[in-house]
């Protein structure tokens, strides 16, 4: 699969990544607005990572650089956003796997924290997670929503890795 992705142009790879990001955000918005699931702070962090990756992919598709430098830049930034999302999703899955007595207590809402705390404090508290992040709201095929998101970020990461592999293959 990586070899197939390596053969794509920058525009094709970025459009594929953008499509994957749109799919991930579409599912998140359906879960929120159709099924009424309120996103927890870690869910919002994962959405931010998807939007960052989507932004990089969109700019890369529009720019469509011809050289390896541009290809590497967009692939590297998209990989960074994907790894960020992967890390937040992994933290979310870990919180959900904790026994109930080890789950952190619920903290104030994200809106309140954004109003009264400095940005770095908000980020550290959001990434630490809270009790609401440990709740499991159903499953699909035996996997929770954060587990599916973790899988989504792993698949998303394959796209910039394939783009980077294209640089290595072209140099040979």
Swiss-Prot record:
Highest taxon above the source species: Bacteria
One GO cellular component term noted in the UniProt record for this chain: plasma membrane
Function recorded in the entry: Required for disulfide bond formation in some periplasmic proteins. Acts by oxidizing the DsbA protein.
Matching Pfam families: DsbB
Stretches assigned to coiled coil: none
Record protein name field: Disulfide bond formation protein B
Record topological domains on the Cytoplasmic side: 1-13, 66-72, 167-172
Disulfide bonds: 40-43, 106-133
Periplasmic-side positions: 31-48, 91-147
Native organism: Chromohalobacter salexigens (strain ATCC BAA-138 / DSM 3043 / CIP 106854 / NCIMB 13768 / 1H11)
Transmembrane segments annotated in the record for this chain: 14-30, 49-65, 73-90, 148-166
GO biological process: protein folding
Record key words, sorted: Cell inner membrane, Cell membrane, Chaperone, Disulfide bond, Electron transport, Membrane, Oxidoreductase, Redox-active center, Transmembrane, Transmembrane helix, Transport
Membrane topology: Multi-pass membrane protein
GO molecular function: electron transfer activity; protein-disulfide reductase activity
Stored PANTHER family: DISULFIDE BOND FORMATION PROTEIN B
Transmembrane helix found in the keyword field: yes
């Amino acid at each position: 699969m990586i070899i197939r992705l390596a053969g794509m142009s920058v525009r094709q790879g970025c459009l594929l990544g953008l499509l994957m990001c749109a799919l991930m955000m579409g599912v998140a918005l359906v879960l929120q607005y159709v099924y009424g699931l309120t996103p927890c702070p870690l869910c919002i962090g994962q959405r931010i990572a998807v939007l960052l990756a989507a932004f990089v992919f969109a700019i890369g598709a529009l720019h469509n650089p011809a050289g390896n430098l541009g290809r590497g830049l967009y692939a590297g930034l998209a990989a960074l956003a994907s790894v960020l999302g992967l890390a937040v999703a992994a933290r979310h899955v870990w919180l959900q796997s904790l026994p109930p007595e080890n789950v952190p207590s619920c903290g104030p809402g994200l809106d309140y924290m954004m109003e009264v705390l400095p940005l770095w404090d908000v980020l550290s508290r959001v990434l630490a997670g809270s009790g609401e992040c440990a709740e499991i709201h159903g499953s699909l095929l035996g996997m929770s929503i954060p587990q599916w998101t973790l899988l989504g970020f792993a698949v998303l990461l394959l796209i910039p890795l394939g783009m980077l592999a294209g640089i290595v293959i072209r140099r040979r």
